[in-house]
């Protein structure tokens, strides 16, 4: 079967070779762009033609945007600044940044969705303000946690006191439209924006432009699936101007109105039609084998077995394995898969990189954050929950920062059967663990900087720790970015908030692997497979809530309201 992207490349090379330089092809991501470029280059091999513009949807949006996307931390500080200014104007008390942080993070999610889906913000906030019979049933654990954090009440009280929830909820949305506008104004004054707002502004901008305002005679959108309302508006405008063409990756056999998986394509295909017919007259049905594996980590061994079997059956050429993909819905198994690939495969291309969130330093900082979160003042003395101390001690980085004294402390906890570990116990027997626990009441930024510096210095002594050091250096750079933004906004944060900001800054960050996309065995995440076709596909973790992933929306907008606004 001919790959989808190759079909599009071939039909344009055949019919439009002399006009391609006037066209722009827009694809979902960089991965699909690379493959399409290769297919088009092959198709034009014997033709005299100037190559067209090839871009991704995100780069396309950036091209028409007059603002730069701000980092998440800067967005949070700007939102807090707008909130504080509004509170001062209304002569109301306002919370410090630590109190506001989790609420602000959730509001940024809501603002982003509101704009990406072209929702009338004023109307939405009015409806949220007047939502009748608000009950606690729809509240997720995340929402309850934020209410507890922001209004200073217990989760149990939130669940039991629906009147409190209603009044707090209404209070939240009272000035939300004003806050939303103030936030947008603050961003624009600095030449900044955020993802959803960028999509909205570009969609509105393109909607006012004519065909002659673009540098291309035709813009071809290839391989999209689910569209946001902003993307759909862009598609509709280009269609109306008569300068668009659309190609959807689907098999007619799967376009069943009762199949939820084809719900969106059933809408898009009749509305955004293709100039050329690239459908196969006889759709092929894949040969699917399902293998049961008793453990997640054991999947790597099964991958090895499957690869060896494909080679033995002449279904896979080790010298040209680009048509075989290993797809990982769970990034954490990338190392076990790499270790399991047979040595006969000399070339491997890993497109997903290694997640910073799966690194040792990430787990160590999580342990420190948990330690900080559950500490208490007992009998006038700062005390830590014993499980958090034990978890911290079990991490190899704990010794790098605090020495072997941390292991002595765990032994003392067991001997005394302590439930909470007071500050005095930590210092018993001459144990100097103040740097690890940060109990000298120093600035949180100084504390975390020292932690990262000590770990980095310890890792420097062994050349085999290059990847771990890279992760630590990434966190050090992120911390410096946060420090710069904090100084600019003159905001102080506590340790717990600093750990949260670090986590948000590094969210989604990866260590990229160097490779040749068009050579070797392909190892990738699910989203990177969009618009791509392979002869052999090995998908791990085909379990419920993993594939597809169960998404929990961190939002204050109930699902019923979300559905009403599309």
Language model: regions and residue ranges:
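Residue-level signal for short amphipathic helical patches enriched in basic/charged
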Residues: 190, 241, 529
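Basic/charged alpha-beta structural segments of nucleotide/phosphate-handling enzymes
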Residues: 30-213, 229, 408
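Extended, H/D-rich, highly charged conserved domains that either
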Residues: 171, 212, 218-270
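Residue-level detector of anion-binding/catalytic polar loops
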Residues: 189-192, 244, 347
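Anion-coordinating catalytic cores for phosphoryl-, nucleotidyl-, and glycosidic chemistry
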Residues: 1-61, 65-71, 219, 235-236, ...
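Short, compositionally biased "basic patch" segments
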Residues: 159-185, 258-285
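Short, Lys/Arg-enriched, disordered terminal segments
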Residues: 1-5, 209-212, 240
């Amino acid at each position: 079967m001919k790959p989808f992207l190759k079909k599009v490349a071939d039909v344009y090379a055949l019919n439009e070779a002399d006009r391609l330089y006037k066209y722009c092809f827009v694809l979902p991501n960089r991965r699909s762009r690379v493959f399409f470029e290769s297919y088009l280059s092959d198709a034009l091999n014997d033709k005299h033609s100037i190559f067209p513009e090839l871009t991704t949807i995100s780069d396309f949006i950036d091209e028409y945007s007059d603002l730069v996307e701000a980092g998440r931390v800067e967005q949070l500080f700007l939102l807090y600044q707008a909130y504080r200014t509004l509170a001062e104007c209304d002569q109301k008390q306002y919370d410090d940044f630590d109190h506001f942080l989790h609420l602000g993070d959730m509001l940024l999610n809501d603002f982003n969705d509101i704009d990406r889906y072209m929702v009338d913000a004023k109307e939405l906030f009015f409806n949220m303000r007047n939502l009748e019979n608000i009950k606690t049933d729809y509240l997720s654990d995340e929402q309850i946690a934020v209410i507890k954090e922001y209004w200073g009440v217990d989760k149990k009280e939130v669940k039991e006191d629906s009147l409190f929830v209603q009044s707090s909820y209404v209070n939240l949305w009272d000035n939300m439209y004003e806050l939303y506008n103030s936030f947008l104004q603050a961003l624009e004054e600095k030449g900044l924006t955020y993802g959803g707002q960028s999509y909205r502004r570009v969609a509105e901008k393109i909607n006012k432009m004519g065909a002659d305002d673009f540098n291309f005679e035709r813009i071809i959108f290839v391989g999209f699936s689910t569209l946001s309302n902003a993307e759909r508006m862009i598609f509709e405008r280009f269609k109306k101007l008569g300068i668009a063409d659309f190609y959807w990756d689907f098999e007619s056999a799967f376009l069943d109105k009762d199949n939820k998986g084809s719900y969106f394509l059933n809408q898009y295909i009749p509305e955004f039609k293709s100039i050329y017919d690239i459908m196969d007259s006889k759709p092929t049905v894949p040969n699917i084998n399902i293998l049961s594996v008793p453990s997640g980590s054991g999947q790597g061994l099964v991958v090895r077995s499957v690869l060896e079997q494909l080679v033995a059956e002449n279904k896979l050429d080790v010298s040209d394995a680009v048509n075989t993909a290993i797809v990982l819905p769970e990034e954490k198994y990338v190392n076990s898969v790499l270790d399991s690939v047979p040595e006969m495969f000399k070339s491997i291309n890993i497109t997903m990189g290694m997640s910073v969130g799966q690194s040792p330093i990430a787990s160590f900082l999580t342990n420190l954050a948990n330690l900080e979160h559950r500490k208490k003042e007992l009998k006038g003395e700062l005390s830590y929950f014993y499980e958090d101390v034990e978890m911290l001690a079990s991490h190899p980085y704990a010794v790098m920062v605090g020495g072997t004294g941390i292991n002595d402390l765990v032994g003392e906890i067991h001997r005394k059967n302590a439930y909470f570990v007071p500050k005095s116990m930590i210092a018993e027997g001459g144990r100097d663990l103040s740097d690890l626990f940060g109990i000298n009441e120093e600035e949180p930024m100084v504390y975390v900087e020292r932690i990262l510096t000590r770990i980095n210095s310890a890792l420097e002594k062994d050349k085999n720790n290059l990847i771990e050091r890279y992760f630590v250096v990434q966190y050090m750079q992120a911390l410096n970015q946060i420090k710069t933004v904090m100084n600019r906004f003159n905001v102080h944060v506590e340790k717990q908030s600093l750990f949260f900001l670090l986590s948000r800054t590094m969210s989604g960050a990866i260590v990229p692997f160097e490779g040749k996309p068009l050579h070797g065995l392909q190892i990738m995440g699910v989203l990177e497979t969009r618009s791509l076709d392979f002869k052999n596909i090995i998908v791990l973790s085909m379990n419920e809530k993993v594939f597809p992933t169960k998404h929990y929306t961190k939002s204050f907008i109930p699902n019923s309201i979300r559905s009403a606004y599309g």
